Amino acid sequence: MSSNLTEEQIAEFKEAFALFDKDNNGSISSSELATVMRSLGLSPSEAEVNDLMNEIDVDGNHQIEFSEFLALMSRQLKSNDSEQELLEAFKVFDKNGDGLISAAELKHVLTSIGEKLTDAEVDDMLREVSDGSGEINIQQFAALLSK
């Protein structure tokens, strides 16, 4: 699972992990997960940490082994890369370069990335994130798709 990580990244993660592995038993408590992630530049919410914990604590011991942590970080970095790719795609479809996508542009973007959404679904998405202008900015779009 961690095959997309460089040796440098693995070493950085191991160092951060070791700082919180106080008794050197190869694991950290679930309550320390958020602190470790923040030390690596991520900013997970409490709910996200709980969700992640439920997913990665595969043996259910409320401890996170380094292998579980590496799998998590690999996935988190991949997610961040996907968000960056999404932002780049957004910019491509922002025809006039004003940082906004209209409903028509959004429909085109969603069709281009393989989504098969109806007009009503796109309208619902716009209503959820728009300030009422019928357009959304890059940050609103990324936030919408990361929910």
From Swiss-Prot:
Ca(2+) 3 binds at D94, N96, D98, E105. Changing D21A: Highly reduced affinity for Ca(2+). Ca(2+) 1 binds at D21, D23, N25, S27, E32. Pfam families: EF-hand_7 (PF13499). InterPro entries: CALM/Myosin/TropC-like, EF-hand-dom_pair, EF_Hand_1_Ca_BS, EF_hand_dom. It comes from the Eukaryota. The N-terminus is blocked. Residues 8-43, 44-79, 81-116, 117-147 form the EF-hand domain. Disulfide bonds: none annotated. Calmodulin mediates the control of a large number of enzymes, ion channels and other proteins by Ca(2+). Among the enzymes to be stimulated by the calmodulin-Ca(2+) complex are a number of protein kinases and phosphatases. Component of the spindle pole body (SPB) required for the proper execution of spindle pole body (SPB) duplication. This protein has three functional calcium-binding sites. This is Calmodulin. It comes from Saccharomyces cerevisiae (strain ATCC 204508 / S288c) (Baker's yeast). The lineage of its organism: Eukaryota, Fungi, Dikarya, Ascomycota, Saccharomycotina.
